[in-house]
Regions:
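Short His-centered aromatic/hydrophobic patch
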Residues: 103-108
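A conserved mid-protein helix/loop that constitutes part of the nucleotide-sugar donor-binding site
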Residues: 25, 205, 209, 214-228, ...
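Short alpha-helical donor nucleotide-sugar binding micro-motif in glycosyltransferases
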Residues: 266-267, 274-279
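Aromatic "clamp/platform" in nucleotide-sugar-dependent glycosyltransferases that forms part
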Residues: 287
Length: 378
């Protein structure tokens, strides 16, 4: 088949460029690389502002690094925004002149049938089993399950990010999927400057969690475990609350009385780079993940990581990280104490991390694999 240049539409994310979540990073990395390879890519951004506040809005132009940006009407109401943008995005994609429409996340796939009806090749990436997340109300969870079933029935290809999700679709639906993981890129280590000014942090003086403040990330366990660890190191909890302000307030209440625990809110740019670059360890205590980009990024910065034993984490780190039993506060406490007391072990894991993760997960290779999947019947 001739290698024709493709017209591609991506939707299901909030906005690019942004770090509002892992999906936004994935869409940006794929879209910009596909444009660099000569394809035409359009991304449907939600209307409205960054979930952590309009002060974090980054880009309002109609193009970003060659990627066309179109704003999709969105009802900016908690629990409704994702649904409304996927409905209007699905309609617009159906009538657009695209070879491929790529839906990201389960919920938006509820509209996948419409572009498919209009003859588009439709691909779905399942970034995680979103209906299992605590934050969704009954309406949102029902819509997400509808999206999952639509993807199974109508998608030409389904991409999954972990073996456990691949097994889920095979066991529940008998549906074959393609495993194409997320990627990571090599970075430049930054010395502590801004984070010293803002939080008094220096190299190796803190344990880092970075991600959205949502229940399934296991932050409750992390705070409870850390409070019982005898260490001078601080615990930095970096991330925005998204649709879950109530949960973020619950976490801050739980952390009360321990001045070592610092909530930074949403971070990006230099502050984010410095936090990754200077952490003693990075921890991801999640109960539920798709494929955690923050974990890939943390390892690319040469971090020793402590992760829960869910397969989505263990498949990434293999034997290059410390692992604790999911949801087990006492086991997490033991791992934190081991890390704080065994600096040589931490140093060994730090030294292995960057080369291991950057050779295993390469964005250029992943973009090409995705394009090969797009070309299936075109």
């Amino acid at each position: 088949m001739a290698r024709k240049k493709l017209k591609i539409c991506m939707l299901g994310h909030k906005r690019i460029p942004s770090r509002e979540g892992g999906i936004e990073i994935v869409v940006e990395e794929l879209a910009t690389r596909m444009v660099a390879l000569g394809h035409e890519v359009t991304c449907y951004n939600r209307s409205g502002h960054h979930v952590s506040g309009k002060e974090f809005d980054q880009h309002k132009n109609k193009e970003y690094k060659g990627v066309k940006l179109k704003t999709i009407f969105t009802l900016n109401i908690k629990g409704i925004a994702a649904m409304s943008s996927s409905v209007f995005g699905g309609i617009r994609a159906a009538f657009g002149k695209y070879d491929v429409v790529h839906f990201h996340a389960e919920g938006p796939c509820a509209m996948l049938w419409l572009p498919k009806l209009f003859g588009k090749r439709c691909v779905a990436t399942i970034h995680g089993l979103d209906h299992q997340r605590e934050k969704w109300n009954k309406l949102a969870s029902t819509y997400i399950m509808l999206g999952e079933k639509c993807a199974v029935k109508f998608a030409d290809e389904i991409i999954v990010l972990s073996e456990s999700v691949q097994n889920y679709f095979e066991d529940i639906y008998g549906r074959k999927t393609r495993f194409i993981p997320n990627g990571v890129k090599k970075i430049e280590i930054k010395s502590a400057g801004l984070i010293t000014e803002k939080y008094g942090l220096t190299k190796d003086s803190y344990i880092l969690f970075l991600g959205r403040l949502v229940p399934e990330k296991g932050i409750r366990y992390l705070i409870e475990a850390f409070k019982d660890v005898q260490t001078d190191k601080k615990l930095i909890i970096a991330g925005g609350s998204s649709d879950t302000d109530e949960f973020a307030n619950e976490l801050k209440e739980l952390a009360k009385g321990d001045e070592r625990i610092i909530f930074t809110g949403f971070v990006q740019g230099q502050e984010l780079e410095e936090l990754y670059s200077n952490a003693y360890i990075y921890t991801l205590p999640s109960d539920l993940e798709g494929m955690p980009l923050s974990l890939l990024e943390a390892m690319s910065y040469g971090n020793c990581c402590i992760v829960s034993n869910i397969s989505e984490c263990t498949e990434v780190v293999e034997d290059k990280a410390m692992i604790f039993k999911k949801s087990d506060v006492s086991d997490l406490k033991i791992r934190l104490e081991e890390a704080c007391n065994q600096s040589e072990m931490v140093k060994v894991l730090k030294n292995q991390a960057t080369e291991f993760i950057c050779s295993k997960y390469n964005w250029d290779k992943i973009a090409q694999e995705t394009l090969n999947l797009y070309r299936g019947n075109i």
